[in-house]
A protein has these predicted regions:
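Transmembrane-lumen/periplasm boundary regions of multi-pass, lipid-linked membrane glycan transferases
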Residues: 143, 154-241, 254, 258-262, ...
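Aromatic/acidic, Gly/Pro-rich catalytic loop(s) in extracytoplasmic/lumenal soluble domains
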Residues: 283, 376-444
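Membrane-interface transmembrane helices that cradle and orient dolichyl/undecaprenyl
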Residues: 78-83, 117-134, 144, 166, ...
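Specific aromatic-rich, kink-prone transmembrane helix
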Residues: 91, 109-126, 136, 140-141, ...
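Transmembrane-helix motifs of polytopic, lipid-linked glycan transferases
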Residues: 47-51, 55-79, 116, 120
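Transmembrane alpha-helical segments
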Residues: 282, 297-323
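Short acidic/glycine- and proline-prone juxtamembrane loop motifs at membrane-interface regions
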Residues: 97-110, 264
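Short periplasmic/luminal acceptor-recognition loop of GT-C membrane glycosyltransferases, typified by
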Residues: 20, 319-322, 335-390, 439
Length: 444
């Protein structure tokens, strides 16, 4: 949101000197904001009014999630039949972990592009007008990479679909041209502004941060064990069947994720659709091969899984766990003026700086690692992100030590047992935990 609003205000997709992601994510959201006259919103400092700032982007993300479900249905319908399509898309729609596709994330934006590229490549094998569909497929995949670099791993499954149709290298080249050219806008823009060294530094920095993919596997297994078991069982079946379509979608991304960069739970989003597809095919296979003889028993099992998933998701989405975030933001807006430096994460800084035009609000609290605080008084909104990042530099811990807690906003998430399913999903909502408002004098 911060970068989209910055693009809306300045017309420049590049924010500062940090090159961590390409531009299409903020371009897409900024376009929606512009079409809905978002800049004309004039919220008050009341916490309820502040929530209205997220209404338009959240509706947009919800529509993208609906589109994802439709695209999954069409892909599976063509490849595996209508029964598998119904099961796969239904699992994607109702299982608890798929709530993440409604969040304002780059992965949520690129998912329809990836699914659209796969669907167009499949359609290209069933028509005489192959070249145009292949080019459009490459364009969508190029835009996905222009949203977030890891999307490049999807080229393996799309190129395989295109090549196996006519066994022509020329078809693959048609796909690769837009796929490669569109993401090149990012480094070319950096070269234009004589910032290619910063671009290299930003890209390399992300590859040097690392943790084990087992951490992500473990976290996924905890927060949505049903999807984890069904999805990986479906992938295991795909291995036994040598289903190249599913394996070329799943394996390259997992290899990339395990070898490069820092992994978080939402990085798994790229392969959630293929896991739902694999799970749907697995559930259909149980009936197809008469593993369960009685149709009524099979239907009962399927309905049981879907109802269980729907109920679990409903138990999650009926709760508002973000109220303390807006209360904390409202408190800061109403109690501190421009003469105070406010250190906070990008979750809040864009509202303070771009919407309410407050001065002395760095885009990220980590700015104090590179630039000194110039005001006499400093306020810190200490949330889970700040606590996790304390190891990034001594300045963050020093700022914490030199401030005292003025106000605390407890999150509603504390009222749930996050060890009990489906509330295990609450573990992925660190922003909704305790937020401290701390202030100090001469924090340097």
């Amino acid at each position: 949101m911060r970068r989209a609003v910055n693009l809306l205000d300045t017309g420049n997709p590049q924010e500062g000197n940090v090159y961590d992601h390409p531009y299409f994510g903020q371009i897409a959201i900024a376009s929606i904001l512009a079409m809905t006259h978002y800049s004309e919103l004039k919220p008050s400092t009341d916490s309820d009014s502040l929530q209205s700032l997220y209404m338009i982007p959240r509706i947009f993300m919800g529509l993208l999630a609906v589109l994802d479900t439709f695209l999954i249905y069409k892909i599976v319908q063509i490849k595996y039949g209508i029964n598998a399509a119904f099961l796969s898309s239904s699992l994607f729609a109702v299982l608890p972990f798929t709530w993440i596709f409604k969040r304002i994330l780059l992965d949520s934006i690129l998912m329809p592009l990836v699914l659209g590229a796969i669907l167009l490549s499949i359609y290209s094998t069933k028509t005489k007008h192959k070249s145009m569909l292949i080019i459009f497929s490459g364009c969508l995949l190029g835009l996905a990479v222009f949203t977030k670099i890891p999307a490049f791993t999807m080229i393996f499954v799309v190129a395989w679909i295109v090549y196996t149709d006519r066994k022509k290298i020329s078809d693959v080249l048609l796909l690769l041209v837009p796929f490669l050219l569109i993401p090149l806008i990012w480094p070319v823009n950096a070269i234009t502004f004589d910032q290619f060294d910063l671009w290299q530094k930003g890209v390399l920095w992300q590859t040097q941060r690392t943790n084990s993919i087992l951490d992500v596997f473990g976290f996924f297994a905890v927060i949505d064990p049903l999807m984890f078991v069904l999805g990986l069982s479906g992938i295991a079946l795909a291995v036994l069947r040598r289903d190249k379509f599913l394996l070329l979608w799943f394996i390259p991304f997992v290899i990339f994720l395990s070898s490069v960069g820092y992994k978080q739970y939402f990085h798994w989003m790229m392969i959630i659709p293929v896991m739902c597809i694999a799970a749907g095919i697995l559930m259909e296979s149980i009936r197809k091969y008469d593993i369960i003889k009685k149709k009524s028993v099979y239907v009962g099992i399927v309905l049981g899984v879907l109802i269980f998933g729907f109920t679990s998701t409903t138990l999650l989405i009926i709760n508002d766990i973000s109220d303390n975030q807006f209360q904390a933001l409202s408190y800061v807006l109403e109690n501190y003026n421009d003469g105070v430096t406010i250190l906070t994460s990008p979750v809040y800084s864009w509202i303070l700086y771009d919407v309410f035009e407050r001065e002395n609000v760095p885009k990220d609290y980590s700015d104090i690692l590179f630039h000194p605080i110039v005001t006499e008084k400093t306020v810190i909104m200490v949330d889970e992100h700040y606590r996790i990042d304390l190891a990034r530099g001594p300045q963050l811990q020093n700022a914490l030590d030199k401030t005292t807690t003025i106000q605390t906003f407890e999150g509603a998430i504390a009222g749930f047992d996050s060890k009990v399913y489906p509330y295990t999903n609450m573990q992925a909502n660190g922003e909704a935990t305790k937020i401290e408002i701390r202030e100090g004098i001469r924090v340097r």
